[in-house]
């Protein structure tokens, strides 16, 4: 692999100052550097990757053992080596084929849990399951991290399909979050879902207790309007939640990969079991494509290789995710966790420190909002930010088709502007037409130059349906896997979240005045003194 890395770096240095636009002298450039899956088109032709770079990147994936590790993952091998676990979130959307963990086929249990979820959701949506004040009108999902970001993103994304109770999400331990969520709801017609695998997550359980007290202000049996997504049956029982409303999942489903199963309960309530199954089917379709398509035509592999080229080879530290779809407003935040918690590591699988950078910083906002915020830096800043645009051919509001046309035209315009830029000669001509001359024209022209030659990709699709969202989420999941394999890291643990938790527990008695700050650094001690409650 070392030789391939070196060859990639040498090639990148040789073509670093080449105009990407010049690559389109090849009339088949766009077609050759695009890949399709059904109605989905991934266009990566506006990058500086040429045939040589593409072939080297594909060789890199082969040398890293992506194909072998991919089959190990799907087969239930314990590829999460630091925790000794399989990685089988894919089984949640592929329940029609046996998958064995430690020699046991896990799919019958998955199908049973899925059927229990469907039955509960149908009862709730039909009104057979009622609150103590009538049919359930609102659902509040309490969770954090993977128990929040995925289902919250998906519920917003699939709002046109949401014909069930209103679903809201509480994650932050900041009391303002749960206060503002509950203040206009009726406890007697609200269901609260507590999503915590261990039922010990401090933020989630603090909010759950607050919700239970709120529920008790209107109903005689608060726990009767709670459901849980947890494997801790003893703790859910102690909380008062009946076992029929407790849905568990296995330790081989990581939190940030878990919305395909019980963590997606709120999503299933919102859109119904049939549309939820369409979401699963979309993910399963991407799984099949990922397993079967050759690397040169494989969307997750190519998305990963483009990302590796920009981050590891070109040295671009960030990646902007720019969905031109307001209902995908939460996608960048979801992908922040998916990618940065998975591949934000500094130690390789063998325990040695990495000799290269790990995953990039992922951020973004929906278009066109971002155009009036941070696109200034993307177009004219001194750092190059590779951009990933997402856009649908068709919206959900036929009476607002003219607005969707504006949306799509803006998306394509931004992608083209990043590629093409605007030269100083073009800027001068524009200013001259406005009547400027001489030194003032020259001064102003410099400010109106767009360097261009900034890479971007576009993921286009017909319409944001449940199946399409399933394909998109699975695409990014597998992208993370491929990047992690090539970087030599474990994408499925998250030890980086632990230290802060431990220190927070120690700081609580100090902030309450029950303990001194001995042993703390001067800054922390000063802040404790100032913020003491």
Curated annotation (Swiss-Prot):
Q: Name the enzyme's class.
A: isomerase
The catalysed reaction is:
alpha-D-glucose 6-phosphate = beta-D-fructose 6-phosphate
Question: Known PROSITE patterns for this protein?
Answer: P_GLUCOSE_ISOMERASE_1, P_GLUCOSE_ISOMERASE_2, P_GLUCOSE_ISOMERASE_3
Look up keyword Cytoplasm and say if it applies.
yes
A Pfam entry, by short name: PGI
Superkingdom of origin organism: Bacteria
Q: Under which name does UniProt file this protein?
A: Glucose-6-phosphate isomerase
Recorded source organism is Cereibacter sphaeroides (strain KD131 / KCTC 12085) (Rhodobacter sphaeroides)
